[in-house]
């Protein structure tokens, strides 16, 4: 029986899981990102965003906004809120671009 290759969407989900797991647990709970782990994630995986910020506290404010249950860490659901927000912002930016001739 042949194995079915994962779809593009399934590969994207696997990638998100792998990235989260790569950063979570370096300081303890491997199911959550600590503030330091989140900062490392942002500076590594979203470096173009963080390097273009004039306010160095922007990452801390993002963490606070994303931390829905106020436990000082981000679980996978809270992490996905960040990813979803970025995806929506990118999609919206594409919608406002003028059409190509």
Swiss-Prot record:
InterPro entries associated with the record: EF-hand-dom_pair (IPR011992), EF_Hand_1_Ca_BS (IPR018247), EF_hand_dom (IPR002048), S100/CaBP7/8-like_CS (IPR001751), S100_Ca-bd_sub (IPR013787), S100A11 (IPR028482)
GO molecular function per UniProt: calcium ion binding; calcium-dependent protein binding; S100 protein binding
Pfam family, any one: S_100
Positions bound to Ca(2+) 1: 30, 32, 37
An example Gene Ontology CC term for this record: cytoplasm
Gene Ontology biological-process annotations: regulation of cell population proliferation
The keyword Metal-binding is annotated on this UniProt entry: yes
Identification of the protein by name: Protein S100-A11
Organism encoding this protein: Gallus gallus
Gene: S100A11
